[in-house]
Amino acid sequence: NSAKAICPSGASTGTFEAFEKRDSNNKKYLGKSVLNAVNLINTKISKNLKGQNIHSQEKIDAIMINLDGTKQKKKLGANSILAVSIAAKKLSAKEKKIPLYKTFLIKKNFKLPYPMMNIINGGAHANNGLRIQEFMIRPDRAKSFSDAMRICFVVIKNLQKLIKKNGLSTSVGDEGGFAPMINNNNQALDLIVSAIKMSGFVNGKDVSICLDVAANELFKKNKYSIHSKSFISVDKSIKEYKKIIEKYKIKSIEDPFAENDWISWNKLCLLYTSPSPRDKT
């Protein structure tokens, strides 16, 4: 038996993320090939995993992590380690003759999480000038995963119609969302709200809007250019967040500030969560 696995890759990555090994000096693929990562799998990793029990996932992962020996997987590369780890898990399921999901700790009452669909791309995922990287929808009142997919499909199709109606392109960005040539976050949000309504749903109840800002890309000298191309202070940025959260009933925001800017993150969180005594101090 055999199993295959592939690893994801992203256009915008944080300082603390696991390292992706690429052949930066290989001109054939403009430095984007992974021949060295594949070679490490076929030699170093393979040599150390030979003879291991395919069902001992924790041990397999521990061997590779220890073999690398760095916090961010910089020697072997996270793409080498993760690909082997996933392939091992898939092969274990195949050997046991059970579906992959049944090899995890949960033994009954299996449930799929509802998806957050990335439907408009901006930031590093598109070249349209939108500051926010991902505009997503979440089908909050779906009765099942298939119903969630249906709801998202209907909203996406109606969004496509609205974008065309506005004379804009329905080309897509890096992650499959539409990337119309607009440079105003509110215009993107207005389109999504209209698509939700056009689909027969209520924004903020049936379907909610969620954002991935990727604010690291929009941070300079303690200021942010999240809401327009102009860099403004943290306090002004939070006021702008407050406006769109309340106007568009935003339910989730990923990376609203730079990865090390915990003070700004806390300020925003305290506006919309019940703080513990420690948070208040």
What is each of the regions a protein language model found here?
Residues 2-4:
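Short, mixed charged/polar active-site loops
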Residues 8-94, 98, 149:
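Metal- or metallocofactor-binding catalytic centers and their adjacent structured scaffolds
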Residues 42, 46-53, 64, 68-72, ...:
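Structural signal for hydrophobic packing residues in well-ordered secondary-structure cores
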Residues 73-93, 114-130, 174-177:
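Conserved phosphate/anionic-ligand binding catalytic regions in large, soluble enzymes, centered on
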Residues 109-121, 202-213:
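Glycine-rich, aromatic-flanked loop segments that form ligand/cofactor-binding clefts
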Residues 126-271:
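Metal-dependent enolase-superfamily TIM-barrel catalytic cores that perform enediolate-based chemistry
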Residues 272-281:
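Single conserved hydrophobic/aromatic residue that forms the stacking wall/gate
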